[in-house]
């Protein structure tokens, strides 16, 4: 199978043209786990709603408080240009949730990322870089999440750590912390 080409990527279009009223629900509040790995805990629920006219094509997404995410999965060598906590933070968490939950097609999850970044006024070139990165290379993360879930891993906490140095790897070994 050859390398995907630029022409094989279809950027989602917003009905009615242009940006509709913002559909991000609640700002994202996260806390970083301790340790070397970059894992974050979503402190409050967030959500995303389709723009008016797009309700038939896209479905709302609600991310529960306690969801554990790596935010934007950007390779370390791109962090100066695309930090994992950029303007697209909210969209990255929604996207991580959709990739974890897998209740909809991967293409829809990627399109929701694009639309949410558009509504959050993320610059076009940044949106393109992130969208194309996940759209062309996200299958590995999608498959890895499916395998982790099948093996019993959970990503939604009911109990949050109060120790700032506890790592995600340590915390997830405690059976009484999951929702």
List where the protein language model places each region:
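Extended terminal accessory/targeting regions
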Residues: 1-179
């Amino acid at each position: 199978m050859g390398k995907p080409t630029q022409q094989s990527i279809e950027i989602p279009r917003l009905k009615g043209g242009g940006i509709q009223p913002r559909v991000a629900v609640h700002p994202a509040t996260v806390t970083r786990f301790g340790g070397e790995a970059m894992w974050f805990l979503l402190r409050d629920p967030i959500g995303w709603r389709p723009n008016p006219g797009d309700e038939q094509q896209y479905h709302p997404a609600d991310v529960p408080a306690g969801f554990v995410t790596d935010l934007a999965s950007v390779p370390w060598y791109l962090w100066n240009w695309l930090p994992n906590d950029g303007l697209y933070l909210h969209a990255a968490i929604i996207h991580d949730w959709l990739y974890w939950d897998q209740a909809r097609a991967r293409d829809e999850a990627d399109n929701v990322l694009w639309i949410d970044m558009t509504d959050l006024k993320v610059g076009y070139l940044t949106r393109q870089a992130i969208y194309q990165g996940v759209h062309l290379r996200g299958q590995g993360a999608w498959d890895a999440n499916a395998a982790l879930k099948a093996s019993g891993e959970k990503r939604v906490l009911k109990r949050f750590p109060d120790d700032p140095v506890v790592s995600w790897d340590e915390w997830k070994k405690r059976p009484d912390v999951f929702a």
